Structures are given as C-alpha cells and as structure tokens.
Amino acid sequence: NTSPKKSDCIVVAGGDGFMLNILKRFYMIKKPFYGINCGTFGFLMNKFTFTDIERKISKAKKTLINPLELIAIDKNNKRKKLIAINEVSLFRESKQTALIRLKVGKKIIMKKLIGDGVLISTPAGSTAYNLSVHGPILSLNSGKLAITPISPFRPRRWKGKIISNNMRVKINNLDTLKRPIAAVADNMEVRNVKSLIIKINKNIKLVLLHDRDRSLVKKIKIEQLRKNIK
C-alpha cells in the first residue's frame, strides 16, 4: 500500500494486455515489474497466487527488455511518438490492400509490398502476433528484430526479414489517398499514417521479474520447441 515511486517493485495482477499498459505507464520510474496472471494466457505473467509474494519476488529472475520506439506521421503531418513492448503493426484501414515501402537503415528492402500490412516484432513479442502470422521466434538475447508481412499479395512468397536491433526501420505509405493504413504499437493506434520510423530505444530499460521455473527465456524456448515439432 504505497505509491509506485516509493515501492521496491510494482506487482501487476491481470493479463498480458494490462501488463503492457502498466509497463508503458510506469516505466519512467525505473522499478521492476512482477506480474500475477489473472487473465487468459499470461505469457508475461507468473502463475496466479497471492501467497509468499515477497519471497517469490526476492528470488525471481530478472529479464531486461528494451521497447520499440515508434514515430508516426499522419496525412496531416501530425507526429505521434509511442513505445511498443511486443510489436508495431501496420494494417490497411479499408477494403483496399496496403501499398507500402520498407527501408532498413539506408537500404530499401522492399520497394512495393502489397498486402494487409506488416509488423516489426521484438524478441519478447515474437511468440505473440508475430508467430500467428508465421514470423520467426527470436531468442531474448538475439539482438534481433523480426519484420513479418501480414497476408502478403505481392510479392506473395516474401516471408519477411530478421534484422539487427541496431537498425532503424522506415515505412512509407505509397498511396495515402486510396489505401489508408493504421499503425498499432501493442494496443495504441494511429490512423491515416503517411510514414513510420521504428527503432529500439535502448535508453528505456524494462525489468520483468519471473519465477525461476517460468522465466521469459524458458517460455520462449518452449514455444520454439512447439513450433519445431509442428
């Protein structure tokens, strides 16, 4: 029963979505976060219990996460800055497919991508929406990001790209008038986007605490094994 600033640790009771909201709301006070799963899946959380919490927190394994930083410019040239722990997704807003250009660093890796959209995932988010659209699972310490197309129409067989997390990704909407697109940073949306710049913000360090038998590293390895078995 104390304020987040005066606490040693922030205990979050809820699901993954609630945890993402709390991380974004309180990351600037630089406290570790211990999640208790009261939701459905709870990938970022620990097993539901309210007994022996202090002991579990003291013995918990720390995981350091750097989020993505998104700068979106809409068709009216308004800028919006957001962070994403899992992924930044780009979606078509209408019946028309999205028509976008992808640039990594100084190199254009895709002059024209036609499809429902594209997403850029962190290792922590690579087992979430990224995996559902057949993206790769990334190890937490890989130092990589995944660029994964969403229902690509042209080029139909493009599976995406794994890049260094030191690289900056720029995405341009090539037809803002007929093919509007929206950008989503985890669960925060910007509509009518003209261009995006996405990069890892290494100045923001999020510390998640997990019980040693359910660490984030172990959970990701389990998902990798499941994917390989399939």
Regions found by a protein language model. Give the residues of each.
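Catalytic core of DAGKc-family lipid kinases
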Residues: 40-117
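Short glycine-rich anion-binding loops that position phosphate/pyrophosphate groups of nucleotides
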Residues: 15-18, 39-41, 124-127
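Gly/Ser/Thr-rich active-site loops/lids in small-molecule metabolic enzymes
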Residues: 112-113, 119-156
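Short acidic low-complexity segments
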Residues: 1-8
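Glycine-rich phosphate/dinucleotide-binding loop and adjoining beta-alpha-beta core of small-molecule
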Residues: 16-35, 44-47
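A glycine- and small-aliphatic-rich helix-loop capping segment at beta-alpha/alpha-beta transitions
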Residues: 26-31, 49-53, 134-143
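ATP/nucleoside-binding phosphotransfer catalytic cores, i.e., glycine-rich phosphate-binding loops
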Residues: 82, 90-91, 107-109, 158-230
